[in-house]
Amino acid sequence: MVLVNGKTINLMKFKIVPIKGDASFRIFYRIILNNKTKIIVLSQKEKYKNLVAYSAINNFLNKNKILAPKLYSHNYKKGMIVIEDFGNLSFYNILSKRKNKFQIYKQLVDLLVKIQKIKPKRKVKNFFGKSHIIRNYSTQQLHKESDLFFDWYLPLIVKKKKSNIIKKKTKKILSSLYKRLNLPNSIFVHRDFHVQNLMKIRSKIGVIDSQDALI
């Protein structure tokens, strides 16, 4: 038995199915009861901060008419939230079976444009009033993102000695380019907008994995 939002729930009545997640420290389960489903999200790291961001940014998107999972209940101290289930049909699945992909990609690009037209808000609240501050995009953040290439991909295609040389030269060039950037910090950036994070929900497009958004 567990207590959720003041109600005692018998977990023995639920069917719980693990869901293959993304490359993160979150674990996902689908709970099924009377043919209705919800998603449990467990965070193994930065429990409170990570899950408040997850639900607060989803709430912000919903308020701006972008479909994102709603929060049903939470236990931030134990690193758990229960959210709306958008199913298994991602646009990755849809596109892999379609020959003519243009119209689908157009829909997705139109959605991206709509997201980037949202008036950004620094402080956002989740469905229960908990606050999250959306951070600015910075040159430091850009370096972190480009480092993923050096840490994960480059070692797979070249030997270590050569990899270190390429890394040093490329980082120097990137550093020079990043210094020239003028980051206005005036646009909402999802940062994980790709077909596996875009779900088909009847005639609509649902957006997931929005917790790392920046301005």
Stretches with model-predicted labels:
Residues 11-32:
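ATP-binding glycine-rich phosphate-binding loop
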Residues 14-17, 69-72, 208:
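A short, local hydrophobic-aromatic micro-motif
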Residues 24, 47-50, 215:
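Alpha-helix N-cap/loop-to-helix initiation residues
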Residues 26-31, 40, 115-116, 174-215:
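Active-site acidic catalytic loop and adjacent metal/ATP-binding pocket
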